Regions:
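N-terminal small/polar loop signature for handling phosphorylated ligands or for N-terminal nucleophile
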Residues: 17-90
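Single conserved hydrophobic/aromatic residue that forms the stacking wall/gate
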Residues: 1-8, 13, 188
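A glycine/threonine-rich phosphate-anchoring loop and its flanking beta-alpha core
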Residues: 85-186
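Glycine-rich His-Gly loop
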Residues: 10, 68, 120
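A short N-terminal beta->alpha junction/helix N-cap motif
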Residues: 9-10, 14, 39, 166-169
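A generic structural signal for short coil/turn motifs at secondary-structure boundaries
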Residues: 1, 25, 164-167
Length: 189
């Protein structure tokens, strides 16, 4: 039996109908699935741990992160914690440095589930990067995770997701892209 876990950013992704075509296709294929949509726009470690706990109970073979960068980043952390429940977040998270010079070796991913990223906006590129940003709700610190193990196994970029997005989301995504471009010009690698 194949099982899939759909990670959506907030209930608005589900309420906007983005999950329906995917859920319909999974039903049509006879794939048992569930949806975890308790992901805030600025995902917290607590939310990621709750998602990983739900995944552990459901035991999916495939994790589908649908939404913007928040859903994909949260999905990556959930995937990491689902695959490696003993992994220590404090070891994985650190101020950003060259991804090739990390002092922590991430555990191998993909033993339990494939990770598929489907963006609904074009702001972060998280669907094709080995990075995730997650906020430690206890300290308020946003921590970057950087390792090639966090690369999704597959990215499905459907332009219909962006073309049907509300104008406000499209504007915010454009500003997000510009912010990332400016930030990278000031980053010392």
């Amino acid at each position: 039996e194949i099982c899939a876990c759909l990670v959506g950013s907030e209930m608005c992704i589900r309420d906007s109908g983005y999950t329906k075509p995917i859920e319909d296709k999974l039903d049509q294929m006879g794939i048992v699935h569930t949806c975890f949509s308790d992901v805030a726009p600025d995902p917290s470690l607590a939310s990621a741990k709750a998602g990983a706990k739900a995944m552990t109970a459901f035991e999916p073979d495939c994790i589908i992160a649908l939404g913007g960068g928040s859903a994909m980043d949260a999905g990556k952390v959930m995937w990491m914690l689902y695959e490696n429940p003993d992994a220590d977040f404090s070891d994985m998270s650190m101020d950003f440095m060259d991804i090739r010079k990390r002092v922590y070796t991430f555990p191998k991913m993909g033993k339990k589930a494939y990770f598929v990223a489907i963006p609904t906006s074009s702001g972060t590129g998280s669907e094709v990067t080995p990075f995730a940003i997650i906020t430690d709700q206890d300290t308020g610190v946003k921590w970057p995770l950087a390792d090639y193990e966090l690369l999704p196994d597959m990215a499905i970029v459907d332009t219909n997701n962006m073309m049907s997005a509300p104008k406000g989301l499209t504007r915010a995504s454009g500003i997000d892209v510009m912010t990332h471009a400016i930030a990278v010009s000031y980053t010392h690698l």
